[in-house]
């Protein structure tokens, strides 16, 4: 099986280099990896290294509370953060708490051996998933203390299939599994793993910390002007279709809208703006304008959404009607009632939990969207009830960072 995997890997690497000629994201994926070993030249043989690996931005945010806690406690250690995806690397490549941020090398035997030899980590921390066979074989071979944090396992994964022996064996590289839920523990137990702790999701610690920071934005204060405001975050075209229908046909003068699209491509932003029949302004055009005169504010930049959620009376979180639901924990920590699309949310534990608790609502079409947001606008006590459920859920699920740190302190 190792031979077949490595042969497929070789063929995929050639294919990716070809696709990179025509695809910008794949080009970043391929070209970025050419810089990995140069970036690692700053790591010396005498350095003590802690290595984190995240697939993309969401997984990085799960690891961030641990990175911050380790940086505070182990000031003389160097921290290396690797990403698989350009969407994570491009946004966090200048993360100031890491000594090196780079792409994870392509999973060939020679690459991973060179990589592990170069960084010689005291501990390897894999976030949520990313089970690369050659990489896991190498850390196991070198006896590196390796842990999985915020892990989730599902029945459909190959580990739990009759033909999954190859991947099951790779899990032996982990010294400990820190999982999000009981279901994942049960699954791992069925294939013989007992080195498991249900720690929960470190993102809860991260979002709770958000409440301690200054979340004020002067331009949002000016725009909102104490008016009822719906914040729609990380929206896709499928979400925006429902949102625009509501704004154009049902919104009254006493409600405002802030839209932060997932894709801030200039052409798509302009199309969104032109589809709205209410007075609308873009973030990129806000200077010198009277923001309070506008009813819709489109945020055509990144990095502001978390703070903007603090201004929401209600929130719509995008992705649930498209490729997958985005982060609902951020609006939840502010005690905001949340609505999202009903098609692609079930793999997100927090979404299924909050749906059962009643803190969130789902929609699939324009009629449902209009009905739920009209009800939320007209019933303040309804909004308060949902928001309280969400905020309580966040506070009751913190503590994963401390649990994981207690283990790391014993091993470093």
Predicted feature locations:
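Nucleotide-activated sugar donor-binding and catalytic core shared by glycosyltransferases
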Residues: 1-412
């Amino acid at each position: 099986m190792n031979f077949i995997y490595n042969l497929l890997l070789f063929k995929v690497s050639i294919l990716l280099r070809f696709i990179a000629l025509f695809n910008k994201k794949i080009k970043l994926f391929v070209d970025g990896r050419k810089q990995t070993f140069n970036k690692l030249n700053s790591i010396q043989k005498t350095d003590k290294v802690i290595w984190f690996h995240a697939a993309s931005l969401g997984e990085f945010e799960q690891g961030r509370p641990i990175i911050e806690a380790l940086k505070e406690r182990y000031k003389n250690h160097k921290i290396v953060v690797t990403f698989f995806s350009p969407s994570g690397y491009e946004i966090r490549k200048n993360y100031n708490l890491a000594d090196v941020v780079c792409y994870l090398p392509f999973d060939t035997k020679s690459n991973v051996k060179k990589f592990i030899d170069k960084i010689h980590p005291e501990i390897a921390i894999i976030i949520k998933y990313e089970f690369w066979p050659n990489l896991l074989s190498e850390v196991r071979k070198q006896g590196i203390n390796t842990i999985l944090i915020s892990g989730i396992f599902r029945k459909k994964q190959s580990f739990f299939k009759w033909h999954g022996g190859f991947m099951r064996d790779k899990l032996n590289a982990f010294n400990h599994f820190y999982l999000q839920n009981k279901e994942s523990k049960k699954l791992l137990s069925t294939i013989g793993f007992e080195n498991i702790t249900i720690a929960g999701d470190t993102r809860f610690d991260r979002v709770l910390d958000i409440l301690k920071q200054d979340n004020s934005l002067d331009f949002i204060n000016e725009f909102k002007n104490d008016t009822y405001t719906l914040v729609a975050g990380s929206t896709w075209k499928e979400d925006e279709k429902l949102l625009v229908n509501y704004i154009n046909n049902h919104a009254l003068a006493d409600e405002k809208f802030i839209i932060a699209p997932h894709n801030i491509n200039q052409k798509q932003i302009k199309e969104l703006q032109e589809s709205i029949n209410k007075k609308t302004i873009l973030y990129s055009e806000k200077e010198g304008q009277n923001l309070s005169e506008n009813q819709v504010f489109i945020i055509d930049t990144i990095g502001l959404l978390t703070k903007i959620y603090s201004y929401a009376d209600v929130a719509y979180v995008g992705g649930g009607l498209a490729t997958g639901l985005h982060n609902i924990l951020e609006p939840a920590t502010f005690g905001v009632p949340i609505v999202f699309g009903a098609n692609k949310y079930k793999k997100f534990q927090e979404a299924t939990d909050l749906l059962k608790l009643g803190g969130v609502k789902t929609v699939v079409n324009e009629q449902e969207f209009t009905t739920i947001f009209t009800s939320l606008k007209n019933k303040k006590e309804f909004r308060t009830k949902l928001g309280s459920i969400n905020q309580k859920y966040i506070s009751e699920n913190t503590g994963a960072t401390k649990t994981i740190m207690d283990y790391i302190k014993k091993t470093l």
